């Protein structure tokens, strides 16, 4: 499978790396260019035991890649996971879904054929 993980925080990075370790081709997308450079050098922005080694091994095996090019990642993938932040709104009554809505809009502008979006 060709999988796109949008967001390289805890959920996106750990899940994407594990999908790659299972043999899938995974491209992780993030707007933060500095974070992408670090990830391409096997430097994880989060701590999870064994994650650095999994990133390094799967990146070298070309099963895991990192980019800022959301449009290209969407077009090259069969499955797209939206893994962006949903912080609590002021007052703590609900989640701020604005990042999800923004990514959904960007996906709609880039999608070129049927995709599974999670």
Show where each model-derived region lies.
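Structural/interface elements that position substrates and couple domains in central-metabolism enzymes
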Residues: 1-117
């Amino acid at each position: 499978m060709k999988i796109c993980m949008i967001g390289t925080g805890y959920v996106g990075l750990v899940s994407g790396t594990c999908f790659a370790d299972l043999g899938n081709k995974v491209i992780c997308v993030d707007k933060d260019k500095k974070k992408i450079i670090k990830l391409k050098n096997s430097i994880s922005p989060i701590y999870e035991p064994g994650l650095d080694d999994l990133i390094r091994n799967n990146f070298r095996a070309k099963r895991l890649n990192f980019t800022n090019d959301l449009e290209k990642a969407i077009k090259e993938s069969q499955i797209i996971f939206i893994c962006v932040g949903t912080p609590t709104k002021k007052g703590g009554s609900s989640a701020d879904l604005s990042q999800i809505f923004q990514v959904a809009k960007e996906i709609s502008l880039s999608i070129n054929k049927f995709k599974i979006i999670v």
